């Protein structure tokens, strides 16, 4: 385990202690910003996303599910692609997300919409950053609708959508 990984896992653990029971944290990365037709601005990760994960790539989402029975830290990220890496730089991919960044599980970002309802099912509370303009709210509505559609088959629909922003401020104080 690398020192950086220990620091980030401690931050996630500190945040987890502040959450209500049966909660899930979802946080999306910043998106790239286009400078002109063939160049992007230098990438800057969302501060809260980086604070909890250390993961510095766009098109990624982290899930923290700290309940005793399902304690998981999951990263959805881009796949490794040697051709794109030649132009845009290194990508950790799913193996790197686990080995370098300490994720319990890692999946391709292309599987996010397919797998997210499964990860949210059974949680009572969903925490997400309401101050990040990354479109996560629209995706959350879609995922919750998918869970509701399966309610007759026993799916448990989360009850509360809560702001992660104030809790992250408290987590900073407690470290």
For each feature predicted by the language model, list its residue ranges.
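A composition/biophysics-driven feature that prefers long, compositionally simple stretches
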Residues: 1-173
């Amino acid at each position: 385990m690398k020192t950086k990984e220990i620091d980030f896992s401690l931050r996630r653990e500190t945040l987890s202690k502040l959450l209500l029971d049966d909660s899930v944290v979802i946080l999306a990365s910043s998106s790239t910003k286009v400078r002109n037709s063939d160049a992007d601005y230098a990438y800057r990760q969302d501060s809260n996303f980086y604070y909890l994960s250390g993961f510095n790539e766009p098109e990624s989402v982290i899930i923290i599910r700290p309940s005793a029975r399902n304690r998981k830290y999951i990263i959805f990220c881009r796949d490794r692609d040697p051709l794109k890496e030649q132009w845009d730089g290194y990508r950790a991919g799913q193996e790197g997300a686990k080995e370098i960044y300490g994720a319990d599980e890692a999946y391709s970002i292309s599987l996010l919409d397919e797998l997210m309802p499964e990860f949210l099912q059974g949680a009572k509370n969903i925490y997400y950053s309401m101050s990040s303009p990354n479109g996560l709210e629209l995706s959350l509505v879609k995922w919750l609708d998918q869970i509701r559609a399966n309610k007759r088959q026993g799916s448990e629909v989360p009850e509360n959508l809560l702001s992660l922003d104030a809790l992250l401020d408290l987590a900073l104080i407690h470290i």
